[in-house]
């Protein structure tokens, strides 16, 4: 191999924040179903702690052996609403606590899958799980939750959209940080290694390793070398850089799967920012030529970035999946925070950006007095974008009690901090209160 390429890879890791964001083991809990919830919870704990017992050790070994930082080790499980439905319990918080206990025993960072799939309607387990979300998330530390409220093939379940607005509001009143651990999806994927939205789909193997990479700093650094060049050159540069980043993800995923004796699933091609300086998706867009993210041209630059990352990634790895795009979480991206504070980026522009990237309105802090119906309407808008464009979209908004526009909230760690953003004060309540199902779009009929 060319020495220059080896040195380039070393520089990517040491100076440009290239890392493996997560090695996530997906574990099926279908064989843990039991009408006795205590037995089910014990089976869940036993299976997770057996299957993933070496996950942290292997992640640390790979980081040491290959010099590639592995930031998070995580587990995702079969949606708990499916597992707990057999129990007839009126409350599923004990299942969340079983997941939390397993995660703490393993020493992992997060466990995802306290989830329900209600895109076309509820079964009883879904209703029970959704009602328990605020309490379950407030009483656990490492559990992440998600609810899928729509899909291109099914339409949007507006009853669920209405309820999730109320859940977000209730959760914020218990502890606003719980909303950082909950995502509301349209077109949720079954092999997502990222949190808080990861769960293990029923079509997946008994256990599988999925990997998420992170390389905004690497892409920005590459673009600094082609200042003033045409957009063709910019796209090609991003594509070649994404190839290298994804190749590393595949290497780590394959090694981890082999050491853990489970199949290798996918590499998620998402560019995931962190609050660290130089690890920002917004700064890539500014390197392309925007004075500040949020101005006119932002959506076009982001569309090109997202597409070029995918093109480079699918050449590098034959198994790609998850969310695969550019994440634009406000609190986790220094450039996004600066743009919001400067007034050049607002929620409406972020919504436009979600049309061309993954995943949606992510880690956005909003005033604590925002009505539940307004939150539901934000969810409905994002779900509509996902449904019509046949892509995954999501909402992870955090109403912060007692705070208003212009103030800041601190989340800590990888979640960073966020300015409170303005939401439209005009009511959407009458529309949300209609309920029902928004039918699937005409182009969903593929058969």
Curated annotation (Swiss-Prot):
One Pfam family matching this protein: DUF711
Q: From which residue to which does the signal peptide run?
A: none
Q: Which residues cross the membrane?
A: none
Q: Which domain of life is it from?
A: Bacteria
- Coiled-coil features, chain-numbered ranges: none
Q: Which InterPro entries match?
A: UPF0210 (IPR007841)
Family annotation (SUPFAM superfamilies): PFL-like glycyl radical enzymes
- HAMAP family noted in UniProt: UPF0210
Give the protein family: Belongs to the UPF0210 family.
Q: How does it assemble?
A: Homodimer.
Q: What is this protein called?
A: UPF0210 protein LSL_0162
């Amino acid at each position: 191999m060319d020495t220059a390429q080896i040195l380039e890879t070393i520089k990517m890791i040491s100076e440009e924040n290239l890392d493996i964001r997560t090695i996530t083991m997906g574990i099926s809990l279908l064989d843990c179903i039991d009408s006795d919830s205590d037995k089910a919870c014990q089976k869940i704990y036993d299976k997770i702690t057996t299957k993933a017992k070496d996950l942290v050790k292997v992640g640390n070994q790979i980081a040491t052996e290959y010099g590639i930082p592995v930031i998070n080790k995580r587990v995702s499980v079969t949606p708990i609403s499916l597992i707990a439905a057999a129990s007839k319990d009126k409350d599923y918080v004990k299942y969340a606590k079983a997941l939390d206990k397993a995660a703490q025993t393993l020493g992992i960072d997060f466990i995802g899958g306290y989830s329900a799939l209600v895109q076309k309607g509820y079964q009883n387990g879904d209703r029970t799980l959704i009602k328990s979300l605020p309490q379950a998330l407030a009483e656990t530390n490492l559990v992440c939750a998600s609810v899928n409220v729509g899909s291109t093939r099914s339409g949007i379940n507006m009853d669920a959209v209405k309820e999730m607005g109320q859940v977000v509001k209730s959760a914020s009143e218990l502890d606003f940080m719980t909303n950082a651990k909950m995502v509301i999806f349209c077109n949720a994927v079954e092999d997502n290694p990222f949190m808080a939205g990861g769960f293990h789909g029923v079509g997946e193997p008994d256990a599988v390793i999925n990997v998420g990479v992170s390389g905004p700093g690497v892409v920005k650094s590459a673009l600094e070398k082609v200042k003033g060049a045409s957009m063709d050159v910019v796209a090609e540069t991003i594509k070649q850089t994404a190839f290298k980043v994804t190749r590393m993800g595949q290497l780590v995923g394959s090694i981890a799967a082999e050491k853990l004796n489970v199949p290798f699933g996918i590499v998620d091609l998402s560019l995931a920012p962190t609050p660290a300086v130089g690890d920002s998706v917004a700064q890539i867009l500014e390197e392309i030529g925007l004075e500040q993210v949020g101005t006119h041209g932002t959506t076009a630059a982001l569309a090109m970035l997202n597409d070029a990352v995918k093109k480079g990634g699918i050449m590098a790895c034959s198994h790609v999946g998850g969310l695969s795009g550019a994440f634009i979480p406000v609190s986790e991206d220094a450039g996004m925070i600066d743009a919001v504070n400067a007034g050049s980026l607002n929620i409406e522009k972020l919504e436009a950006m979600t049309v061309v990237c993954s995943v949606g309105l992510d880690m956005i802090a909003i005033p604590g007095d925002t009505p539940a119906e307004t939150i539901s309407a934000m969810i409905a808008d994002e779900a509509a974008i996902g449904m019509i464009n046949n892509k995954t979209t999501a909402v992870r908004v955090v109403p912060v009690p007692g705070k208003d526009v212009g103030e800041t909230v601190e989340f800590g760690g990888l979640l960073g901090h966020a300015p409170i953003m303005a939401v439209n004060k005009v009511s959407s309540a009458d529309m949300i209160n209609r309920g029902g199902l928004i039918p699937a779009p005409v182009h969903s009929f593929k058969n």
